[in-house]
Amino acid sequence: MSKNIALITGVTGQDGSYLSEFLLAKGYEVHGIIRRSSVDYRERIAHLEGTPNFHLHYADMGDSMSLVKLVGKVQPTEIYNLAAQSHVQVSFDAPEFTADVDAVGVLRILEAVRTNHLEKTCKIYQASTSELYGKVEEVPQNENTPFHPYSPYAVAKLYGFWIIKEYREAYDMFCCSGILFNHESERRGETFVTRKITLAAARIAQGKQDCLYLGNLDSLRDWGYAKDYVECMWLILQHKTPEDFVIATGVQHTVREFASLAFHYAGIELRWEGQGIDEKGIVASVSNPSLSHLIGKTVVAVSEAFYRPTDVVNLWGDPTKAQNKLGWNPQTTSFEQLVQIMVNHDMQKVAADHVASVMRTNLAEYLEKGIVK
């Protein structure tokens, strides 16, 4: 029996780390692409390093030759292209970089496979995005909903989607896009709104932050658990024919709902007052007497600084096709469970960070006084 060999771009990210764990558990030989950097950004996969069948290689989505060489060396049977500049707001500040990685990077992967004559033996999964729907024309969105990208990130991802489809039809390659709706976890980057909320709730509950500032509280999103979504990525490549699939829960929530639930799991109940830019989240009650000093205080406020130049306000995915054709369950982890997982993790993180800070302060003081040398 031939061995399953997976090559993952974006292996150090949220999805890459979960996918690596998933594939290793299935007996895959997993190869991940990392970039050379003076900063250590591998904490999400640190626990996997040294694991048999898990290998890391230096390459770059902006360097065609490095990808061609690596694909030729690894000879993968499956490629999961998860690498991206994936922050919508950043794409307005760095549109050219976003296009190079998120659009042309997909083409480089496809050509690396063709250059090594692996078109018939290597399947390719492309991580696409619900941001393709942008200024939505219908709800919920499915595989047939028209695209209306509303940011440089979404436009770049749209190229990636169409070039995958073109190579599938022109060269008979098994390449597919998974149109991922928002998927979160305790490994989510701290600049993304969900992780920003759960960290702030934990910090406010532990006296490390006074207020959380957000943008449009009415924005609607379909949030799922990243750990569940990587299973669907794999199922897409196991399907008998190459097709594109929406990966979503089919359930929608506002940013306001996410914030309310996050603070609830941190022991703080909010009430909302005002509208638009003047809306505020005020502490109505607390579960622990030690937090009683917060009652009546504003802990969530709206800031225009966090409004996007063009804001996508209504993303809601229809996962029916993935359910029927792949047998995937989009709600293995509920919205409430997801938020609780993230808050519990961040409560522990904030507490651990505080202990580490105290230890560093004490050590500095002891060194200054000559107590330790």
Regions inferred by a protein language model and the residue ranges of each:
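NAD(P)-dependent short-chain dehydrogenase/reductase
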Residues: 136-140, 150-152, 158, 162-238, ...
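N-terminal Rossmann-like NAD(P)+-binding domain of SDR-like oxidoreductases, especially those catalyzing
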Residues: 1-183, 227, 233, 237, ...
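Residue-level preference for the first positions of well-ordered beta-strands
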Residues: 5, 211, 242-244
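Conserved C-terminal active-site "lid" loop/helix of NAD(P)H-dependent oxidoreductases
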Residues: 226, 285-329, 348
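Residue-level signal for the nucleotide or nucleotide-sugar donor/cofactor binding architecture
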Residues: 62, 93, 101-104, 151, ...
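Conserved metal-phosphate-binding beta-hairpin within the catalytic cores
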Residues: 247
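A contiguous, mid-protein "functional segment" used to position or interact
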Residues: 326-355
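Generic alpha-helical secondary-structure signal
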Residues: 70, 94, 101, 196, ...
